[in-house]
Amino acid sequence: MSETRFHGARVRESTGLATAINDVDSSVIGIVATADDADETLFPLNKPTLLTRVSDVLGKAGTKGTLYKSLKAVADQVSTKVIVVRVPDASSQGAPDTGVTSFGHLDPEDRAFFGIDESEDAHPVYPHKTQDQYVIGGTDGDGNYTGMYALLIAEQDDAIGYRPRIIAAPGLDTEAVTKSLCVIAEKLRAFVYAGCHNCKKPADAISYRARFNERELMLVWPDFIAHNPKSGANEVFPAAAYACGLRARIDHEQGWHKSLSNVPVRNVLGISSPVFWSLQSEDSDANNLNNKEITTIICRNGFRFWGNRTPETKAYIFEVYTRTAQVLADSIAEAQFETIDAPLTPANVKDVLSAIRAKLDALVTSGRLVGAECWYDVVDNSTTELRQGRVRIRYKYTPVPPLEDMELYQT
């Protein structure tokens, strides 16, 4: 039989390429807010809603509660994806809730005795809940997630498909809410920005900060003054909302390795409480707040957040240390999805090692890491472990610290 010949060049595409590791989207914001007069179709209660152009929906965010100001603050800083969970306003009698109290079993005289308004425009009566209960949420009687816990299911929602990485409840962030947000942040590998609730002076904020030690948190104080187009007045806007928007903008423009500090905040007029700051003075309000891991606000060529730290004082002391760990862990782990359940062969393990090393090298080259390495240790991978389908790969890295303290020696 004659042999078939070919005179030329052929290309055979291989599907066995090393996995490319891309950064997770670190700029997705998650906000919990109130707004009884918001568009109920766009902002249903206790359900995550994805906004891709925040500025386009400000007219549907209402004027009551915290939703409009939170979205306006974000939109003034950046155009990014925002996931909103609207919760009932505890101060409103008509705040909807899943646990409606029914009085249908009472006769008219009893209903009158209890002061139940049966007029057509009367609001239904609901079990009493505090605002913290609404914001924190949990699960209802049907197993549905409510309040901030609804952020946990955003990524698995077909209409959303994104995980919030920057989360806050601006204007609603009491101590209980902030601590609960940190629990959610740990589950999502997200970062929380929160105000110092009810603190009027630097000393109040410093005392408040002593109650926290979470690495997923940055406390900010005071708040901003900004113009509210809906009321026509200059009003207090939560600084945490601006922190979320600015954080997303920095991620877009510079990267998650750059801290929130010393970047101009757009479209603000002032701050809610005075803060003394001097670049060269250790004895200032700003430095005292920073020394207690509170990010404050200064005015120099515009208003700027001033501070880099989390309440965690051991390993993850800087905001960027926590966020670097989060982004790196998720980027590397999520890229292995297609590898899971593939044959555990030396070739596949080498491909994983190659992909991780390439990613780490790229991050070092781009200045997002100081250094990094990845390796396979035979001590971790005994024959017994490998036969059980388990492989262990190690990597380590050095995050990029912010240049926080510069000493200049003049002679």
Each language-model region and where it sits:
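Short, flexible loop/turn elements at secondary-structure junctions
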Residues: 168-173, 378, 397-399
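C-terminal edge-of-domain segments
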Residues: 380-411
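A glycine- and small-residue-enriched flexible loop/hinge signal that marks low-structured segments
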Residues: 2-3, 7-17, 23, 28-36, ...
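Composition- and surface-driven signal marking solvent-exposed, interaction-prone regions
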Residues: 180-182, 374-375, 407-411
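Acidic, low-complexity glycine/serine/threonine-rich segments
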Residues: 317-379
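Intrinsically disordered, low-complexity acidic/polar segments
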Residues: 93-94, 176, 402-405
